[in-house]
Amino acid sequence: MSPLFILLLFSSSIIAQLHSPSHIYHTERLLLIQSNLTISGTVDKVINEKDGDIHIRLKLDSCSNLLNEKNITSQHGCLVIEIICACKVTQPDAITACKNYSNTIPIPKLGDHIIVTGDYVLDKQHGWMEEHPVTKLIIQ
């Protein structure tokens, strides 16, 4: 475990509320583990989802302990990163969540190295770990 991860783990308080919950549809499907977690890695895949979010598979530089078995088997050993309301919403139950919201997070490309901050959550619907929503992203 890297010293940076240990510092982040113990300096961040765990809170029971997600960032921007009004712009996340069905928030009950996400279990907050840690707020404001900063990680880095290389973009393995970028997917525009029907709910308006952009899903990014991030191959982590370190902190592989942030992954669970579902990340290994279903996400090719990557952490899922979600930039909310960043593309066209076609999923009916997600339209309201993105209404009057303008994404300001930059969208990385395949192969980009990024530093990303967001809420580290368990997606109970899919079973894998994510950063959702991303609150800050730097493309290096």
Per-range role (PLM):
Residues 1-7:
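Sec-dependent signal peptide recognition
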Residues 11-12:
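N-terminal signal peptide c-region/cleavage motif recognized by signal peptidases
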Residues 15-140:
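OB-fold and OB-like single-stranded nucleic-acid-recognition modules
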